[in-house]
Amino acid sequence: MPSQQRSSSGSTAKAGDADGDGDAAAVSFLGDKSAKVFIAGHRGMVGSAVHRKLDALGFTNVVVRTRAELDLACQAAVEAFFAAELPRYVILAAAKVGGVHASSAAPAEYLTENLRITVNVVDAARRCGSVRKLLVLASSTIYPADAPQPTPESALLTGPPAEGSEWYAIPKIAGIKMCQAVRAEYGLDAIAAAPNNLYGPRHPFPPEHSHVIPALIRRFHRAKLEGAGEVAVWGSGAAAREFTHVDDLAEAVVVLMERYSGEEHVNVGSGEEVTVRELAEAVRGVVGYEGVVAWDAARPEGVARRVVDSGRMRKLGWEPRVALRDGIQDLYRFYLRHECGGQAHHA
């Protein structure tokens, strides 16, 4: 297997700075649409959105594998795949995902599998010798619970991740640091992004895996079908969050592959900040549930505010397009098409 040579003078592929300037312009991702692009995790919410975006842009050589075809947690299988396929671009969107309750219930499983996926893909991309650019998708769970708001990229490792999030966050932090390490030691143009509170088609709906928007959709829809007079929601509803539609992230991925080659990771957030109460009312309206939302202020609701500073991403020319209510409608349509023929009515 050909391997990436160690850089004798540090990061030979440090093609750009925080604004995406420098040598990155000499190698155009959008001008290389016949090159082989490997999307790891193409069946998930993020990977499928990236796949749709590349197809729409006319990329003709996108390579994907199901988990049955390629177990990304198996080092030998990943190395054999890279040696055979020799992709030019790699986008790592694969992960074992679930809410805080799921990862807290199986911490070793989440930590180990996500570390293996990250290490295997980044190392194989570095070793195979064909990869021109690698993008690792992390998560805003990497930041401490007491990070400044909006949270800048520089808040990474200024404290531990929020309690309960660490089993998912630690492998994501490792992915960012691996990108920096292979860039410094081998000159590979490896970059990372940290999207915030993603939602969209293919978001999991089972209670043990879902996040707030799909959970609210499922609960309000069930209450509407059953004629329930109220739906209980934890907390006071005062906590503020931002939510980023996965199609906006897919556009950000293309922008990053085209314009960014900096060492530091990049936040990706919509900038549309809402309270959980406003979110619940928006979901209730989209679903058409006419009952009451009963707020249980005795229950925990997390940190008071969680928003990321996406100024670096916006300097690259990216702007989110999907308004929150439109995104909720999009996800509800997906839920009705793909979930409501089976357990979604009764779970």
UniProtKB/Swiss-Prot annotation:
Q: Where is this site: Lowers pKa of active site Tyr?
A: K172
Note the site residues: Important for catalytic activity: S139
Reactions the enzyme catalyzes:
GDP-beta-L-fucose + NADP(+) = GDP-4-dehydro-alpha-D-rhamnose + NADPH + H(+)
Q: Where is this region: Disordered?
A: 1-20
Checking Gene3D superfamilies in the record gives: NAD(P)-binding Rossmann-like Domain, UDP-galactose 4-epimerase, domain 1
- Tell me the superkingdom of the source: Eukaryota
Q: Where does NADP(+) bind?
A: G41, H42, R43, G44, M45, V46, G47, K172, P195, N196, N197, L198, H211
- Where do the catalytic residues lie? Y168 (proton donor/acceptor)
CDD domains, sorted: GDP_FS_SDR_e
- Coiled coil, from the record: none
Q: Which HAMAP family match?
A: GDP_fucose_synth (MF_00956)
> Its function?
Catalyzes the two-step NADP-dependent conversion of GDP-4-dehydro-6-deoxy-D-mannose to GDP-fucose, involving an epimerase and a reductase reaction.
Its assembly, as annotated, is: Homodimer.
Q: Which PANTHER family match?
A: GDP-L-FUCOSE SYNTHASE, GDP-L-FUCOSE SYNTHASE 2-RELATED
Can you say what this protein is called?
Answer: Putative GDP-L-fucose synthase 2
What is the protein's species of origin? Oryza sativa subsp. japonica
Q: What is the lineage of its organism?
A: Eukaryota, Viridiplantae, Streptophyta, Embryophyta, Tracheophyta
